[in-house]
Amino acid sequence: MRELTLLNDRITHCTACSRLVTYRETVAAEKRKQFEDWTYWGRPVPGFGDPHARLYVLGLAPAAHGGNRTGRVFTGDRSGDWLFDALHRFGFANQPNSYHRDDGLKLLDCYIGATVRCAPPDNKPAPEEFMACRPYLREEIRSLRKILVVVTLGKIAFDHYLKACRDEGLKLPSPLPKFSHGIVRVLPWDITLIGSYHPSQQNTFTGLLTRPMCHHIFATARQRLAEPDRRSK
């Protein structure tokens, strides 16, 4: 637990990427009209949840007026509305909503992280920004020692989780799994990797991701966690 606390402290003080620093601080200063009475977080957003979790949910990056405003991943935006509703439905959260850091939300046997910790312009981090954030992702993966199931939200998170594992010296399967919604693969180190479309407005408004599809992902995660842990044998 102390490892994650120290990691998250370092994350919140990171200034490695000048483009992201400028953007996150500009958004925090200018604000969106509906949030003009908020004091925006305007810094990198750390991971959040149960340090002893068996489920790890990995997203892309904080939203400019979501996590960059509230200081908590997936909090205060429509993507979070979908995610926390699903987590609550399957027993991974104590409530279905996430509005601000002090709203009483607790994750149960679940931890949420991101491939990039600062809100990027147009929701598109640059390749060098992914690389700059990779050490944080690797350290988060190392620190979450009880993880059995990983749900990646979107192709980018799926691919970068595998890259981080490779960088950690873990032997990736061959052929390498390719992202698709609902893909389930047991990796050589006995972690179950599940791919899901990201619950972004673009995906949910167009129907690419529906509520039943989202719920099925976390029903699968819950089912996998109910199975015996082969690593204990």
Annotate each predicted stretch with a short phrase.
Residues 1-177, 181-229:
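A polyanion-binding, active-site-adjacent surface
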